[in-house]
Amino acid sequence: MAKEWGYASHNGPDHWHELYPIAKGDNQSPIELHTKDIKHDPSLQPWSASYDPGSAKTILNNGKTCRVVFDDTYDRSMLRGGPLSGPYRLRQFHLHWGSSDDHGSEHTVDGVKYAAELHLVHWNPKYNTFGEALKQPDGIAVVGIFLKIGREKGEFQILLDALDKIKTKGKEAPFTHFDPSCLFPACRDYWTYHGSFTTPPCEECIVWLLLKEPMTVSSDQMAKLRSLFSSAENEPPVPLVGNWRPPQPVKGRVVRASFK
């Protein structure tokens, strides 16, 4: 029971509820999106992000993903609009990916799995701290972007070039002057629903904005992401791959689309 969660058979998503009961809750993420069942909601606004590149601080390998951390001590890098009631502060972004190009995303669209999924995590500063926001149904807003295989994305390469400094679990390196909006697709259409973090403790505090249009990266770029290790420097090497949670039951939740 007292084991660290992970993605292996003995500590993977099927076991998370043993340590974190909410992982079997009614508002868990990710989910399967069935576009024929999703209604367009004309009241949904466009969303916008104004990110300060100077707020990017570090990149780290925590053994579960690679994460870029931002300064969120004041309103520097903000997400607004869409289904949100007010502005949200960017705290970090991270990725989920598979062991090969044909899977790796957490959400699926009409059965399609993408090669990876990028999550930009923001919190609602009306709750004063990130920790307080985690306890509120509208505490967190995550922009999810699918990665599909195609031509190389130059802006993504900036991130990948930093991975050599964080090959193994526990490594952290400076990562500054980066505006993640350079990764956004041209089309801002999105789906939205109420869900949870896709990693333990799986708190159900998230307003999801899932972008319809994926970001295109090359197969070589995905291979670079898979060159990370989930093991520490002094341990036998274990590749960091397959860090995705499968879709969870929708349980009557409504998914809305910002587009027809």
UniProtKB/Swiss-Prot annotation:
Pfam families: Carb_anhydrase (PF00194). Expressed at lower levels in adipose tissue from animals that were either genetically obese or had experimentally induced obesity. The modification N-acetylalanine is found at residue 2. It catalyses: hydrogencarbonate + H(+) = CO2 + H2O. Inhibited by acetazolamide. One of its GO terms (molecular function) is phosphatase activity. The keyword Metal-binding applies. One of its GO terms (biological process) is response to ethanol. Residues 3-259 form the Alpha-carbonic anhydrase domain. Reversible hydration of carbon dioxide. This is Carbonic anhydrase 3. The lineage of its organism: Eukaryota, Metazoa, Chordata, Craniata, Vertebrata. The gene is Ca3.
